[in-house]
C-alpha cells in the first residue's frame, strides 16, 4: 500500500552523504544545490483516498497540507514545535495545560481561527457518532479529560475539562496527573467550528468532504478538486499564516495497484513513490536516473491480530501460531534487507526491547504439540484477513498461510478495503487479521489492546496490562523503559497478537524535488512541511542525507509567535 510522506526544509545535516546506490544506508532528506524557488506542481502516488478523512488514521497522509495542529512533532527528536499554539504551560501537578493560540490565523474561507475551533475539534475526535475517534490512535488518552466520558455518553454537551478563556486561550484539564496527555493533544487536527455546527454528529460522516466548501483548514494548501478514481489536487494557500508555500499545487494521483504507480513513476508521470517493495529497492538502488531514495520508520511492526473467537481463547493456540511462523525464512525469501524478525512489542536493538521476555523461535513441532494440548480441531478453517493490496502483501500472506497449514491450522485469505475490515471487526466477524502501525506506541497499544480500544476486536482485557499502559502514558525515561519491559513479559506470555516482523520504509523522489523528507520516526502525526518543498529542474547535485537533530523545523514562522 502506498503511504504519502511529509516534506520539510531542514538546513542541518551530517557531513557524510549517502544515495540510492546503497539503498539500505539511504538518508532521509533530499538536498539540492538550488536556492528555494516558487512555482510548480508535484504529483504523489497513492492507492486510496478516504472521503471522510476522520474515519481512519491512514487519512492523515494526504490531509496534512490542509489542516493545522496546536503544535507539530519534530520527526527526528519528538520535540514539539509551535503551530497554531505559539506556546503553552503545563501545571506542576500535570493536570492542567494552558494553550496560547496564534493570532491573525484564518481558515481557507477567511474566517478567523479561535479557541472555539480547538474545543470543537476535540469533541469531533471523541464523539462516537461522528466516527472521528478512529482517526487518532491515541484518542483513548483524550478520555482522561475531566468530564470526557459524560460527553461521550451524551450526558453533557460540553467537556468539563475543556475551557475556552478567550479567543486565543484554551485550558485543558485532566482528571489525573498526566504530563504526556498534553503531547497527545497536538495530534488533533483543528477544523472550523462555524462550518460544521449546523450538522448533527451523525450527519458529519455523510457530508461531501471532498468539496472545497467542506474540507477547510488553516494549512499551507487548500482543497481544489477531487475526481473519483483519478486524483485529489490542492492549491497553495496565498494567505497561509507562515507565508505562501513554494509549490503552486500538490496532486495525489490514485492508482488501484502499487505496480501501476511504480510504472507511472518510471515514466516520469509522478514525482514521489512510497513504500517500495524489496524488488524495487534493489532495482532502484542502481539509481540509473539519479532518483533519490529516502529511508525512514525505524519502528513499524506488523502483527497477526487474534480475535476473541472461542477457539482462540486458549493462549496455547496463540502461542502455537507464533512458533509456527519462520520469520527469518519469510524475510530472506521475500524481502531481504528491509525487514527484521520480531516476536515481541519491539525489534531487537530498540531501546525498549526486553531480551528476557518469552521468545518464539521457529518450532513447528512445538506448535503442533501446543495445538494438540489445546484440543484444536484440525478441520477448523479460519479467515486470515487483511486490507493490504500489494503483490508483496499477497506473497507474505501466502507464506503465513503455508506455515499455519503445516502445523494443522487451515486458513482462508480474505482481502478487503480498510473500511470493510473495520466493519467486520466491529461486527465480530474477524478471526485472524494482519495489520501494522508505526506512530504513537502507547496510543496504538491502547487502541489495539486497551479494554475500550477502537481496534481491540479481540476484546483483550488484562487489568494489569491496562494499568501498565496507563502508567506508560504518564511516564518517561528509565521509568518508561521498566514499564515496557514488564508489558513485554505479559504480552509475550498471553499473545493477544502475534508480531512477526519490523519493516523499514523506503520511498523514491525525482531528483528535481528538493527538501523531500522521509522522517526517521512516525511518532507524531502532526508534522506538516509541504510548504518548504520546491522544484529545481536544473539541479546538478541532489543528495540524500541524514539530518542532525534540527533546532527548528518547518517554515521559519514556526520559530516565532
What do these predicted regions represent?
Residues 43, 114-123, 167-173, 177, ...:
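Alpha-helical secondary-structure segments
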Residues 119, 134-198:
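Surface-exposed binding/hinge segments that line
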Residues 124, 209-212, 237-283, 410-412:
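Ligand-site clamp/hinge motif
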Amino acid at each position: 500500500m502506498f503511504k504519502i510522506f511529509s516534506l520539510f526544509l531542514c538546513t542541518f545535516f551530517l557531513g557524510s552523504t549517502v544515495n540510492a546506490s546503497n539503498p539500505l544506508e539511504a538518508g532521509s532528506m533530499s538536498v539540492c544545490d538550488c536556492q528555494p524557488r516558487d512555482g510548480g506542481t508535484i504529483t504523489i502516488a497513492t492507492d486510496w483516498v478516504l472521503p471522510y478523512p476522520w474515519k481512519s488514521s491512514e487519512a492523515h497522509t494526504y490531509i496534512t497540507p490542509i489542516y493545522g495542529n496546536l503544535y507539530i512533532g519534530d520527526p527526528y527528536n519528538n520535540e514539539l514545535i509551535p503551530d497554531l499554539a505559539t506556546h503553552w504551560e503545563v501545571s506542576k501537578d500535570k493536570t492542567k495545560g494552558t494553550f496560547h493560540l496564534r493570532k491573525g490565523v484564518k481558515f481557507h474561507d477567511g474566517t478567523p481561527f479561535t479557541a472555539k475551533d480547538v474545543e470543537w475539534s476535540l469533541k469531533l475526535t471523541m464523539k462516537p457518532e461522528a466516527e472521528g475517534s478512529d482517526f487518532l490512535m491515541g484518542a483513548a488518552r483524550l478520555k482522561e479529560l475531566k468530564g470526557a466520558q459524560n460527553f461521550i455518553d451524551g450526558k453533557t454537551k460540553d467537556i468539563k475539562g475543556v475551557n475556552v478563556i478567550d479567543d486565543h486561550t484554551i485550558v485543558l484539564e485532566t482528571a489525573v496527573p498526566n504530563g504526556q496527555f498534553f503531547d497527545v493533544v497536538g495530534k488533533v487536527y483543528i477544523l472550523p467550528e462555524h462550518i460544521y455546527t449546523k450538522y448533527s454528529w451523525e450527519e458529519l460522516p455523510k457530508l461531501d468532504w471532498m468539496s472545497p466548501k467542506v474540507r477547510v483548514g488553516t494549512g499551507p494548501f487548500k482543497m481544489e478538486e477531487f475526481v473519483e478514481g483519478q486524483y485529489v489536487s490542492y492549491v497553495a494557500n496565498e494567505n497561509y499564516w507562515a507565508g505562501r508555500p513554494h509549490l503552486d499545487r500538490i496532486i495525489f494521483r490514485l492508482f488501484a495497484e502499487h505496480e501501476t504507480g511504480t510504472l507511472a513513476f518510471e515514466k516520469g508521470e509522478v514525482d514521489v513513490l512510497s513504500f517500495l517493495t524489496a524488488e524495487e529497492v534493489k532495482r532502484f538502488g542502481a539509481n540509473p536516473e539519479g532518483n533519490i531514495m529516502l529511508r525512514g520508520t525505524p519502528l513499524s511492526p506488523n502483527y497477526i491480530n487474534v480475535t476473541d473467537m472461542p477457539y482462540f481463547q486458549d493462549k496455547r493456540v496463540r502461542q502455537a501460531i507464533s512458533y509456527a511462523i519462520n520469520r527469518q525464512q519469510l524475510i530472506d525469501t521475500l524481502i531481504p534487507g528491509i525487514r527484521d524478525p520480531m516476536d515481541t512489542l519491539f525489534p531487537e536493538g530498540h531501546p525498549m526491547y526486553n531480551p528476557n521476555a518469552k521468545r518464539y523461535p521457529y518450532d513447528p513441532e512445538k506448535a503442533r504439540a501446543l495445538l494438540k494440548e489445546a484440543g484444536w480441531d484440525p478441520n477448523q478453517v479460519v479467515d486470515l484477513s487483511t486490507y493490504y493490496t500489494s503483490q508483496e502483501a499477497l506473497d507474505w500472506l501466502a507464506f503465513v498461510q503455508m506455515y499455519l497449514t503445516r502445523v494443522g491450522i487451515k486458513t482462508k485469505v480474505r482481502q478487503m478495503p480498510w473500511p470493510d475490515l473495520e466493519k467486520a471487526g466491529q461486527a465480530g466477524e474477524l478471526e485472524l487479521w494482519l495489520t501494522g502501525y508505526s506512530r504513537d506506541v502507547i496510543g496504538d497499544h491502547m487502541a489495539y489492546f486497551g479494554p475500550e480500544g477502537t481496534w481491540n476486536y479481540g476484546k483483550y482485557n488484562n487489568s494489569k496490562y491496562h494499568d501498565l499502559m496507563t502508567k506508560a502514558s504518564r511516564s518517561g525515561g528509565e521509568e518508561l523503559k521498566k514499564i515496557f519491559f514488564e508489558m513485554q513479559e505479559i504480552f509475550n506470555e498471553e499473545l493477544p497478537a502475534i508480531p512477526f516482523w519490523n519493516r523499514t520504509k523506503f520511498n523514491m523522489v525525482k531528483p528535481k524535488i528538493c527538501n523531500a523528507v522521509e522522517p526517521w520516526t512516525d511518532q507524531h502525526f502532526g508534522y506538516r512541511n509541504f510548504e518548504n518543498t520546491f522544484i529545481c529542474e536544473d539541479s546538478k547535485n541532489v543528495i540524500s542525507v541524514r539530518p542532525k537533530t534540527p533546532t527548528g523545523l518547518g517554515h521559519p514562522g514556526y520559530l516565532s509567535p
